[in-house]
Regions:
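Catalytic cores of alpha/beta
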Residues: 161-165, 223-239
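Radical SAM [4Fe-4S] cluster-binding motif and immediate context
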Residues: 56-208, 220
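Glycine-rich beta-alpha loop elements in corrinoid/cobalamin-binding modules
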Residues: 1-46
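Short, hinge-like loop/turn segments at secondary-structure boundaries
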Residues: 12-15, 135-136, 233, 262-266
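Proline-aspartate-enriched helix->loop->beta-strand connector
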Residues: 1, 114, 242-243
Length: 269
């Protein structure tokens, strides 16, 4: 995490400072692996404790000009779900930044009239109270300029959330909705807990409001999704008429369930 990277940077910086070089060692940095110069062995240091999200420093207050900038912001880290292609499924922990701290930082961006803030929370609306608190805040503090981007699971949205976002200024928020596939066999195999018909219903309800840009995602190359199946997935989503349809290709990430079962699926990458 951030502490590990900071210490690693300090170590390499010290290499150029002969006075401090003797006091720094990779073995003192928890949470890394490195190759020892002498033994040529791979050394694993002590694991590092999971960092408190609220202790991560806010670094954007050092920027003077926010015009034409996109800010990436994180109010939570981790995901409660187990999608097999995602590394978040390996670490089941889900933690949040203090909500009052989040509001303070978002107000800073709003006051600076940042054009767009992209939340990188893996599933922003996995916690109803957290999502509602932030959505209410951005609605109440709308400056008429800043746009907020959220990655959500559409089938999790309830009536209270839908009512709130339906009353927002057009362009205040945009929603990226991960579908990945409409093949039920594929959805089950990749461990997604997605209610497809509910997702379609929610997408149409949001469209009816005419105030929110919808961005729907698909992944090509998933297990049991051949050309014909993917064509159907594409057609199913295209027929929903999203503002944007994003097609990504499967990335087999080391350590993920997908990586460990790649041979079984016959994946070539």
């Amino acid at each position: 995490g951030e502490d590990t990277f900071r210490q690693l940077c300090a170590y390499y910086d010290s290499i150029y400072d002969q006075a401090d070089n003797k006091n720094c060692s990779l073995s003192d940095i928890n949470g890394i692996a490195y190759k020892d110069k002498e033994s040529k062995k791979i050394i694993f240091t002590e694991p590092r404790s999971i960092m408190d999200m609220s202790k991560i420093p806010f670094c954007y207050d050092t920027i003077d000009d926010f015009s034409n900038r996109i800010i990436y912001y994180e109010s939570s880290r981790g995901c409660p779900f187990s999608c097999s292609y995602c590394l978040s499924s390996v670490d089941k922990s889900l933690r949040f930044r203090d909500i009052e701290l989040v509001k303070k930082e978002l107000k800073f961006f709003i006051d600076q009239k940042v054009p767009q803030i992209k939340f990188v929370d893996r599933t922003f609306n996995c916690n109803h109270a957290h999502a509602m608190e932030i959505w209410k805040f951005v609605k109440e503090n709308d400056n008429g300029i800043t746009n907020f981007h959220f990655e959500i699971s559409a089938d999790l949205l309830n009536e209270e959330e839908l009512d709130l976002i339906s009353d927002m200024r057009p362009g205040l928020i945009q929603l990226e909705i991960g579908v990945q596939s409409t093949n039920e066999v594929t959805i089950k195999e990749i461990h997604r807990t997605m209610k497809l018909e509910r997702l379609k219903e929610v997408v149409r309800l949001i469209q009816a409001g005419g105030n929110i840009h919808e961005h729907l995602d698909l992944i090509a190359g998933l297990p049991y999704e051949g050309y014909d199946s993917f064509k159907k997935s594409f057609d199913d989503i295209y027929q929903l008429h999203p503002n944007q349809l994003q097609l990504g290709f499967l990335k087999v990430l080391k350590g993920s369930y997908m990586f460990n079962h790649a041979a079984e699926y016959g994946l070539i990458y």
